[in-house]
A protein has these predicted regions:
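Beta-alpha junction/loop-to-helix N-cap segments that form part of ligand/metal-binding clefts
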Residues: 40, 55-62, 74-145, 154, ...
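Extracellular/periplasmic Venus flytrap/periplasmic-binding protein
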Residues: 97-98, 105, 141-143, 151-256, ...
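Segments of small-molecule ligand-sensing domains
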Residues: 317-332, 342-401
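Extracytoplasmic "Venus flytrap"
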Residues: 44-65, 87-94, 116, 183-191, ...
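N-terminal secretory signal peptides that target proteins for export/translocation
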Residues: 1-14
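Bacterial N-terminal signal peptides
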Residues: 18-30
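Sec/Tat signal peptide C-region and signal peptidase I cleavage site
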Residues: 31-37
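Extracellular/periplasmic periplasmic-binding protein-like sensory domains
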Residues: 252-335, 404-410
Length: 411
């Protein structure tokens, strides 16, 4: 791997992530110097490589860059290579905002990405001056509703996953008077899950039976599970990450809470190993249903997933049995994000700018990911690519998530 770390004006180290470097290293490393980089098209991300959500950031970057390597191997776009510049914001909102300005003003990035929901909300008022399209690993509904000219949700939102889970309880399970609770962390990410739960329960004219907070630094959920048990909750919306899901299922069993737990998008950021490794893990897995807006790496019958798997095997030199070691977490999300940005770049013409790329994204209609997601469409008043999700159960024997059915359109 060609790696060069250099100091720009001001003495701050920065790392260039080239699409020709190995994708595992791309989550951490660097690519090239200024002269070469100026000849390439550039996207940029204020990522988390060392903070509490570094798991998301590293896997997202790996998936993004596998797709760029495929694009560059085929000749790039307009004869130029496409690369990803990555800075480590370590889940710090102020650093994310600072890097966004840098991407536009110093690095000539054509589009930018950040990690946090809080950062996305803080950045929205700044984008008219920064003037590059903005996306995030977090996918809150409020990022795209109401629509903002520069902010895009490529995927169905956290709200969509919550709505689908509650609809499943009422319409598929058939419980017309369910006691539903919600577990969420503090901050904007958590509030998105709480708001969505309250809003969907209002549709069915039922109250939320219990609302409990589990912070990002908490590793024990006993107190929260006791509160849910006291409220006689039978279904729980868990708007959190995968490691917290494992703790919640473990401690629910410990206190005797018998319930079905619905995990939203980031709840499946780990493979089921964390759940299955808990005491009685196979039984815990039976109580979990995941809800997410992109297909899983193991759904190999889906054409787009098959192509993605082949690309990973080619560039990582691994066999089928090891694909899960690379394509877990937010890998698929990063891969699809790159697909959308490259398609917009192709439509933006030979001299793209942030504004031209934004307008090209706005013109995308029914962009086909070959089944990794539903078709993706944007418009002047539409900044969310689709509103459909899948529900997943854990196959304990294979240690993978498997879909219960097809795409469920959320209305």
């Amino acid at each position: 791997m060609c790696k060069r770390i250099f100091r720009p004006a001001g003495g701050q180290q920065r790392r260039w992530i080239g699409a020709l470097a190995a994708s595992a290293a791309l989550a951490f490393g660097a690519f090239t110097g200024t002269a070469v980089a100026q000849e390439n098209y550039r996207f940029a991300i204020a990522n988390d490589l060392s903070g509490p959500s570094s798991f998301h950031g590293k896997t997202f970057a790996a998936g993004f860059n596998i797709y760029l390597r495929e694009v560059n191997d085929a000749g790039g776009v307009n004869g130029k290579k496409v690369e990803l510049l990555q800075e480590n914001a370590a889940r710090d909102v102020q650093k994310e905002l600072g890097f966004l300005r840098k991407f536009a003003q110093q690095d000539n990035a054509l589009a930018a990405m950040i990690v946090t929901t809080d950062g996305l909300f803080a950045a929205k008022p700044l984008m008219e001056s920064i003037k590059v399209p903005l996306m995030a690993i977090g996918v809150p509904e409020l990022a795209s509703n109401p629509p903002h000219p520069w902010v895009f949700n490529i995927f169905a939102s956290y709200q969509d996953t919550v709505f689908a889970a509650i609809d499943y309880v009422f319409n598929s399970i058939g419980d017309k008077d369910p006691k539903i609770g919600v577990v969420y962390p503090d901050g904007q990410f958590g509030l998105e899950g709480l708001r969505a739960t309250e809003l969907r329960m209002q549709k069915y004219r039922k109250p939320v039976a219990a609302k409990v907070v589990m912070g990002f630094r908490e590793t024990d959920a006993t107190t929260q599970m006791l509160a849910l048990k006291q409220a006689s909750v039978k279904y729980v919306i868990v708007h959190h990450g995968g490691s917290w899901i494992a703790a919640i299922l473990r401690d629910a069993a410990k206190v005797g809470l018998e319930a079905t737990f619905f995990g939203t998008t980031q709840a499946m950021d780990r493979e089921p190993d964390l759940i299955l490794s808990q005491p009685g893990g196979q039984n815990l897995a039976k109580n979990f249903i995941g809800v997410g807006p992109w297909s899983k790496w193991n759904e190999s019958s889906i054409p787009g997933v098959a192509v993605m798997r082949a690309a990973v095997k080619k560039h990582e030199k691994i066999e089928d049995a090891k694909l899960g070691d690379v394509m877990y977490g937010n890998f698929v999300q990063g891969h699809v994000n790159a697909m959308v940005l490259v398609e917009a770049l192709r439509k933006a013409g030979p001299n793209p700018t942030g504004e031209k790329l934004r307008d090209a994204m706005s013109r995308l209609r029914n962009f086909d990911t070959k089944g990794i997601t539903p078709p993706i469409s944007f418009g002047p008043d539409r900044r969310k690519g689709f509103s459909a999700v899948k529900l997943y159960r854990i196959n304990a024997e294979r240690k993978v998530y498997e879909p219960i059915g097809g795409w469920v359109v959320v209305k």
